[in-house]
């Protein structure tokens, strides 16, 4: 009896040549395509291609809503930005892809799961770490990494096994895309001194060509999650799609930075994440209005750790679950509306309100005579606030000189 294997299939050359190779190795291949919002992909054609090149079964799963609700929403609530810039675009889809692959493997009594990652990147770790966590007994195949095929060798193998070679094979870029953004690397981008050409971008307009008039949008949040755009209630999936389109035409969401990869090397990455730039800026602004000071000061520490965990393939981990429980507890009062100004590559919060959860008290904050703040109480507060430092300094004189005793 032939063993069954489940393949994470994209329709590209790497995973297409993997199918006949895995068949030659003795597997019946189930090719799985996960729709997480890839731009401009005909998934029906990809499904048919998998069958044409030898897959026993080809499955397309529409996972956009689940991706938005279960994976993007936590990133928004936790303001997750790896190294302060990367909104977890590719890293975010991997846990969901693996979850679906493992489920399908179990449903079909498969003994192995395969992916098309190379040995240079983070994805091999993300795929295999999640597989090990969800099913330690599952065998893993990684033909592209394990045999280190060159592009020329892949093309030759494809031609020998009647695998169609994509017409865009001469593209210099390696692209990964989902609902939350687009990642681009390789080619001319590998030299960090080369400015990214315009053909490296697809979701955003060049700032020079962006509209000369700003656009304003209102984003409504409930428990830290966007739920409405300009007053219209939308699913998170549809809201992200809408904001991507609006913000993209204003040149918002381009990221060009040097990234510290999980495998220990630095890489130059180009990202486009228009909705992420707008929604995360709006969310942080609303938190400034609704979070208590100690929580607001401590939360960024947790946010950074969560970003590292997601990037480093530890979405399935007890620490991630524990830290997200803290994040969820902070978001119950993050309710309100933020007005965003979109203009020439910038997404700026210009107004905000929270009817029931705002901690801003205009009567206390005003500098007019109508202020209800008791300024006289400040004198005693300051003395008590600085008491421990005052005592220490007067005993040790680290920053001051001791007073000389005068004898009369």
Swiss-Prot record:
Tell me the Gene Ontology biological-process terms attached to this UniProt entry.
Answer: argininosuccinate metabolic process; L-arginine biosynthetic process; urea cycle
Q: Which domain of life is it from?
A: Bacteria
- Give the InterPro entries listed for this entry: Arginosuc_syn_C (IPR048268), Arginosuc_syn_N (IPR048267), Arginosuc_synth (IPR001518), Arginosuc_synth_CS (IPR018223), Arginosuc_synth_type_1_subfam (IPR023434), AS_cat/multimer_dom_body (IPR024074), Rossmann-like_a/b/a_fold (IPR014729)
Binding of L-aspartate occurs at 118, 122-123
Subcellular location as annotated? Cytoplasm
Q: What is this enzyme's catalytic activity, as reactions?
A: L-citrulline + L-aspartate + ATP = 2-(N(omega)-L-arginino)succinate + AMP + diphosphate + H(+)
Pathway stated in the Swiss-Prot or TrEMBL entry: Amino-acid biosynthesis; L-arginine biosynthesis; L-arginine from L-ornithine and carbamoyl phosphate: step 2/3
Q: Determine if DNA damage is one of this entry's keywords.
A: no
**Which residues hold ATP?**
8-16, 116
State the SUPFAM superfamilies in the record.
Adenine nucleotide alpha hydrolases-like (SSF52402), Argininosuccinate synthetase, C-terminal domain (SSF69864)
Enzyme Commission number(s) from the entry: 6.3.4.5
One GO molecular-function entry? argininosuccinate synthase activity
Q: Which Cys-Cys disulfides exist here?
A: none
Please report which protein family the annotation says this sequence is part of.
Belongs to the argininosuccinate synthase family. Type 1 subfamily.
**Official protein name in the record:** Argininosuccinate synthase
The organism encoding this protein is Leuconostoc mesenteroides subsp. mesenteroides (strain ATCC 8293 / DSM 20343 / BCRC 11652 / CCM 1803 / JCM 6124 / NCDO 523 / NBRC 100496 / NCIMB 8023 / NCTC 12954 / NRRL B-1118 / 37Y)
């Amino acid at each position: 009896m032939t063993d069954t294997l489940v393949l994470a299939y994209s329709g590209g050359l790497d995973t297409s040549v993997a199918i006949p190779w895995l068949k030659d190795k003795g597997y019946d291949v189930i090719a799985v395509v996960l729709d997480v919002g890839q731009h401009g992909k005909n998934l029906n054609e990809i499904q048919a291609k998998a069958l044409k090149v030898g897959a026993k079964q080809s499955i397309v799963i529409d996972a956009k809503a689940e991706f938005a609700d279960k994976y993007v929403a936590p990133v928004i609530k936790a303001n997750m930005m790896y190294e302060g810039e990367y909104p977890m675009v590719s890293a975010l889809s991997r846990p969901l892809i693996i979850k679906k692959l493992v489920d399908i493997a179990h449903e079909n009594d498969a003994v192995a799961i395969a992916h098309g990652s190379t040995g240079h990147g983070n994805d091999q770790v993300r795929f295999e770490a999640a597989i090990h966590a969800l099913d330690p007994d599952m065998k893993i195949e990684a033909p592209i990494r394990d045999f280190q095929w060159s592009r020329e060798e892949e093309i030759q193998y494809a031609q020998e096994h009647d695998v169609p070679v994509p017409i865009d094979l001469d593209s210099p870029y390696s692209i990964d895309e989902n609902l939350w953004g687009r990642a681009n690397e390789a080619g001319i981008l590998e030299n960090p001194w080369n400015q990214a050409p315009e053909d490296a971008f697809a979701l955003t307009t060049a700032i020079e060509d962006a509209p000369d008039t700003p656009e304003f949008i209102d984003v409504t949040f409930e428990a830290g999650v966007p739920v409405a755009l300009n007053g219209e209630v939308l699913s998170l999936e549809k809201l992200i799609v809408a904001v991507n389109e609006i913000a993209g035409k204003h040149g918002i969401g381009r990221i060009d930075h040097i990234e510290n990869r999980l495998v220990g090397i630095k890489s130059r990455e180009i990202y486009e994440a228009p909705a992420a730039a707008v929604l995360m800026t709006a969310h942080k602004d609303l938190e400034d209005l609704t979070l208590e000071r100690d929580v607001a000061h401590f939360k960024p520490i947790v946010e950074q750790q969560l970003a590292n965990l997601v990037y480093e393939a530890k979405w399935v981990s007890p620490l991630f679950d524990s830290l997200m429980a803290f994040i969820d507890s902070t978001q119950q009062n993050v309710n309100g509306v933020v007005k965003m100004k979109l203009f020439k590559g910038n997404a700026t919060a210009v107004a905000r309100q929270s009817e029931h959860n705002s901690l801003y008290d205009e009567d206390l904050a005003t500098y007019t005579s109508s202020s209800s703040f008791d300024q006289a109480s400040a004198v005693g507060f300051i003395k008590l606030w600085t008491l421990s430092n005052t005592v220490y300094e007067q005993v040790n004189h680290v920053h001051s000189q001791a007073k000389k005793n005068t004898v009369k």
